[in-house]
């Protein structure tokens, strides 16, 4: 990992936070933490909420670099990245294409499957396919239980674990309120883990794996961010060879999507044979007090402030 430069060399930095997605509140929490860390380190950092200001104001106000702490749509999906490309302001995290693909779990799966990477079997239901007959047939394809979720949302928003045929229509309707397409996914029974990545290409580095132990109620939006009921184990307690295999798969998944800067992959380890399955890649992960990238980085010897500086140092443009 390269040495962190003089914080003053970053110039005037905008921490993009808030935005208009369903994850706005979490973004404000992430951005607030990043902003304080950068300011404490001596960076000339300022909060910037795209909900309140047009992005062109970044150029007018003389910002030289952006730390993207936005989550979800219009922040993590390539749109803001594209605007910053046009404004020629370097930004943290993945570029336009990788951000757009990773935001869409169906497109992400297609890339991973083409690369021979393990991900649960799935069925995509386009709006014209969400008929009662087709919806009732999905469990015949994937088995029960199964997961129904919006392909372009995060933080477990709109997700249902379907246990029986009678739940399918309501689960699809809930998901469709957040995204016209619906992703139905094979349920992997086992341990949930997550693994962050820092860097780009051959220099990308997988950080320690975190094992997630949810309460009986499940790992939902409320538990993720607003309670202490979920247990996060780092070190993960997994056998060394199993953790190394997860890190290998995550690095391959990160590179396959063309990610850069930083990211975090979520996986399930199937209990029956200990096989890991990729669920999604987050290209602008949370940086709150409950967030997992800072926890993993700390286990690797990188404190929160140093992590923020390292990510900011990697700010770049696609071309």
From Swiss-Prot:
Which residues does the record give as ATP binding sites?
Answer: 139-194
Q: Could you tell me what reaction this enzyme catalyses?
A: 2 D-alanine + ATP = D-alanyl-D-alanine + ADP + phosphate + H(+)
Q: Locate the residues binding Mg(2+) 2.
A: 280, 282
Keywords assigned: ATP-binding, Cell shape, Cell wall biogenesis/degradation, Cytoplasm, Ligase, Magnesium, Manganese, Metal-binding, Nucleotide-binding, Peptidoglycan synthesis
Q: What is this protein called?
A: D-alanine--D-alanine ligase
Q: In UniProt terms, what function does this protein have?
A: Cell wall formation.
Pfam families named in the record: Dala_Dala_lig_C, Dala_Dala_lig_N
> Native species of this protein?
Methylibium petroleiphilum (strain ATCC BAA-1232 / LMG 22953 / PM1)
- Please name the pathway: Cell wall biogenesis; peptidoglycan biosynthesis
The protein's matches in PANTHER family, at most eight in alphabetical order, are given as: D-ALANINE--D-ALANINE LIGASE (PTHR23132), D-ALANINE--D-ALANINE LIGASE B (PTHR23132:SF23)
Please give the NCBIfam families that the UniProt record associates with this protein.
D_ala_D_alaTIGR, PRK01372.1
Catalytic activity, EC: 6.3.2.4
Q: Which PROSITE patterns match?
A: ATP_GRASP, DALA_DALA_LIGASE_1, DALA_DALA_LIGASE_2
